């Protein structure tokens, strides 16, 4: 029965990973009907719905209650994904912009409490996509971002929210582009509520060895995004990504949090433009086939990641 138990347990009765996907999977725009999307994801085997965090500030309390009630009934966890715009840049040279960013993230975390979401994930340390930076400004940007993130961390600690900082690639940010940088950044922030989000798509561009990077992150790994090197669903590009070895590394560090697919298969709309999807990666799939792709990928991930 839905809602009675939403944690997968391993053979020894210990909590293990839960699997899900980003809300935008079926769409061309950064919006959706969250209740219907949650139901569709549940039918595909998902245990996690990753929403757009900024949408929470646009939703009425009754809408937030409805989303929470639906996900509680389905036994689904909600994680909240953020890629702030430039007006909320924590690394900005303008103190007013940094203060605006801290307030923005604090307001989001307060809204997250209303739906029971405890994970805020993404490139909240700056803005996304970040395209107008200069290398010789990086040290100062780091200092500003870290000081602002310390303020965000205080709110996260008060609200029991985990902030997971996404390590991106060189084309989307200059703040955190590999795991070593993320570890150093988190150490400088110095909060148990600020950890790392690794994403196999970005790792495949920037890291030398994906399983070893997971081991390096260790207990700092708070969230994990998965996708093939071309942003297809895990398992769609046969042999391109070392999924079994990635799963082994996750088990070695006793990772027991969320694994969220972040696939982008469709051309068109704001999503296609922002993610740079210039050709159809779905093989002309209709909605039913898209459902099947997701269900097969979730099954694939569980087989590779869970003993």
Regions found by a protein language model. Give the residues of each.
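Catalytic-core regions built around general acid/base machinery
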Residues: 63-73, 151-152, 216, 245-249
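Active-site-proximal loop/turn and secondary-structure-junction residues that shape catalytic pockets
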Residues: 25-27, 53-55, 84-86, 126-128, ...
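Histidine-acidic metal/acid-base catalytic patches
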Residues: 8-25, 32-45, 116-118, 176-198, ...
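Glycine-rich, proline-tolerant flexible connector loops at the mouths of alpha/beta enzymes
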Residues: 50-71, 129-130
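Short acidic/His/Gly/Ser-rich catalytic and metal-binding motifs that mark active-site loops
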Residues: 87-89, 128-132, 268-273
């Amino acid at each position: 029965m839905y809602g009675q138990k939403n944690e997968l347990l391993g053979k020894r009765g210990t909590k293990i990973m839960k699997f899900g996907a980003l809300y935008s999977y079926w769409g061309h725009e950064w919006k959706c009907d969250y209740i219907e999307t949650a139901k569709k994801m549940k039918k595909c085997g998902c245990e996690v719905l990753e929403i757009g965090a900024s949408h929470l500030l646009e939703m009425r309390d009754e809408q937030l209650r409805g989303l929470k009630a639906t996900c509680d009934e389905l036994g689904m966890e909600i994680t909240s994904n953020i890629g702030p715009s430039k007006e909320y840049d924590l690394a900005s040279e303008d103190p007013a912009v940094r203060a605006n960013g801290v307030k923005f993230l604090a307001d989001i975390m307060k809204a997250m409490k209303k739906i029971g979401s405890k994970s805020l994930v993404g490139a909240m340390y700056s803005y996304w996509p970040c395209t107008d930076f200069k290398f010789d400004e990086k040290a100062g940007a780091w200092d500003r971002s870290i000081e602002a993130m310390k303020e965000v961390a205080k709110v996260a600690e008060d609200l029991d929210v985990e902030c997971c900082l996404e390590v991106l690639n060189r084309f989307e940010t200059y703040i955190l582009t590999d795991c070593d940088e993320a570890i150093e950044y988190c150490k400088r922030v110095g909060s148990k509520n600020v950890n790392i989000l690794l994403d196999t798509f970005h790792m495949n561009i920037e890291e030398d060895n994906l399983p070893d990077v997971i081991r390096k992150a260790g207990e700092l790994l708070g969230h994990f995004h998965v996708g093939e090197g071309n942003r297809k669903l895990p398992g769609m590009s046969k042999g391109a990504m070392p999924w079994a070895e990635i799963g082994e590394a996750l088990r070695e560090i006793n990772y027991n949090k969320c694994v969220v697919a972040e696939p982008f298969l469709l051309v068109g709309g704001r999503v296609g433009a922002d993610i740079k999807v210039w050709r159809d990666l779905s093989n002309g799939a209709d909605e039913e086939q898209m459902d099947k792709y997701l269900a097969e990928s979730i099954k694939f991930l569980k087989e590779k990641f869970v003993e």
